[in-house]
């Protein structure tokens, strides 16, 4: 039987474990306040639903979008970065629309990582930061992130200790 080496390298999915614990507690009748996956707990606002319904009726929208996302959306993204962070970005080469953050990070990892490339990832972290680079055949190096450790010192130390130098550093806030 063939092995699936990339899948076997994946750590347990912590959000799946938390969900199982939550479901078990609810089955026992416990009252759970869920601070988990960020699923909405309120309905989508009516004006958004109305606009989506309106857009779904336009025949021009009955096709696949361009692969990088609609230009006006990419322009809005780069304008937002300029307004909020005073960063100039080119909507044609430095902005892309993805289905969501997980998909974007996973595809980024596949695009920039070669087998054996090392990647610095904070721990704890959002699971996709680890999963994406393992699935891209990279080597994940965990950098401690806690009140007891200066993260940037730990990051610099991890960078200096590894050769060849890590190709990617995940910085998330």
Language-model segment annotations:
Residues 2-4, 8-99, 107:
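N-terminal small-domain helix-loop-helix segment of the aminotransferase-like
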Residues 99, 108, 123, 172-173:
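Glycine-rich, N-terminal phosphate-binding loop of Rossmann-like dinucleotide-binding domains
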Residues 147-173:
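Active-site phosphate-binding strand-loop segment of PLP-dependent enzymes
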Residues 123, 142-147:
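Short beta->alpha connector loops at strand-helix junctions that form conserved
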Residues 33-36, 142-144, 168-173:
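Short beta-strands and strand-loop turn motifs
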Residues 111-133:
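Conserved PLP-anchoring active-site segment centered on the Schiff-base-forming lysine
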Residues 134-140:
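A short helix-loop-beta submotif of the ANL/AMP-binding
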């Amino acid at each position: 039987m063939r092995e699936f080496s990339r899948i076997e390298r994946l750590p347990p999915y912590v959000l799946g474990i938390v969900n199982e614990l939550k479901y078990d507690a609810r089955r026992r009748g416990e009252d759970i306040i869920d601070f988990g996956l960020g699923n909405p707990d309120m309905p989508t606002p009516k004006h958004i639903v109305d606009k989506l319904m309106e857009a779904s009726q336009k025949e021009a929208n009955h096709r696949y979008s361009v692969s990088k996302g609609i230009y006006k959306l990419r322009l809005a993204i780069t304008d937002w970065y300029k307004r909020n962070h005073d960063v100039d970005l080119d909507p044609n080469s430095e902005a892309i629309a993805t289905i969501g953050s997980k998909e974007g990070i996973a595809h980024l990892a596949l695009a920039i990582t070669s087998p054996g490339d090392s990647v610095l990832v904070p721990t704890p972290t959002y699971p996709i930061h680890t999963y994406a680079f393992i699935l891209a055949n990279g080597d994940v190096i965990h950098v401690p992130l806690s009140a007891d450790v200066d993260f940037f010192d730990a990051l610099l130390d991890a960078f200096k200790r590894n050769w060849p130098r890590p190709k990617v550093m995940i910085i998330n806030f």
